[in-house]
Amino acid sequence: MALKSFNPTTPSQRQLVIVDRASLYKGKPVKALTQGLSSKGGRNNQGRITVRFQGGGHKRTYRLVDFKRRKFDVEGTVERLEYDPNRTAFIALVTYTDGEQAYILAPQRLAAGDKVIASDKAVDVKPGNTMPLQYIPVGSIIHNVEMKPGKGGQIARSAGTYVQLVGRDAGMAILRLNSGEQRLVHGSCLASIGAVSNSDHGNINDGKAGRSRWRGKRPHVRGVVMNPVDHPHGGGEGRTSGGRHPVTPWGKPTKGKRTRSNKSTDKFIMRSRHQRKK
């Protein structure tokens, strides 16, 4: 996918850079593979704001994407690649030989007409194929990696992301994540071959505030420009620096403060993403 820039006929067009989606399917999604999605606007069931700076945006239909890939040893053909408003990656519509259809995350270099297969045994190392980590060659680039067998892929699902399988140890696979973290995952967990599509997503420039509003994002207001009643950094005469270490609106430390508390899974992290890069 290439990037697309525009003639500056308006001030916002001057900065606008988007992903050229000309090669994607332009019709509606398969109705049987969609669900309704109501906009929450950052509110909970009491109507109170639980996530700030959300609301509005275009109505969306949720596409049911198969992250589990547990339809083993049934070959599928990629019908088309589609845009999905609910995620940064593209999705692929797959029709299996038994007639069933499913959406999967589209990896890079997957095109309409390609064959994909998922198995609990070793299969070809081709983009879109899925198999347990214990059968994937060391050094492979993978995505949509499970953390628990059967739970469905959780790691590397965003546009352009991938994980590298760097080794094996006592039934566990050693993975290197984009963040630099190295962690252990059980060898029976499934993973798909290749990196996730739409790697140019990180290079887009919205060009105007309205594009964020179309996505349901409202202006993100800094604490230092608020009043003291609204934020610990608020108030003061003229511009201030906040006068204290950065905190959330509720007074908890933020900006670099470690928040991970799941000590039971610490043993699976071989190298923290916070360790100094060598």
From Swiss-Prot:
Region (Disordered): 201-278
Keywords, comma-separated and alphabetical: Ribonucleoprotein, Ribosomal protein, RNA-binding, rRNA-binding
GO CC terms, sorted: large ribosomal subunit
A single BP term in Gene Ontology: cytoplasmic translation
Highest taxon of source: Bacteria
UniProt-listed SMART domains: Ribosomal_L2, Ribosomal_L2_C
Pfam families associated with the record: Ribosomal_L2, Ribosomal_L2_C
Keyword match Ribosomal protein: yes
Single GO MF annotation: transferase activity
Compositionally skewed regions (Basic residues) per UniProt: 210-221
Oligomeric and partner information: Part of the 50S ribosomal subunit. Forms a bridge to the 30S subunit in the 70S ribosome.
Function: One of the primary rRNA binding proteins. Required for association of the 30S and 50S subunits to form the 70S ribosome, for tRNA binding and peptide bond formation. It has been suggested to have peptidyltransferase activity; this is somewhat controversial. Makes several contacts with the 16S rRNA in the 70S ribosome.
Family the UniProt entry places it in: Belongs to the universal ribosomal protein uL2 family.
Protein name: Large ribosomal subunit protein uL2
Organism this protein belongs to: Agrobacterium fabrum (strain C58 / ATCC 33970) (Agrobacterium tumefaciens (strain C58))
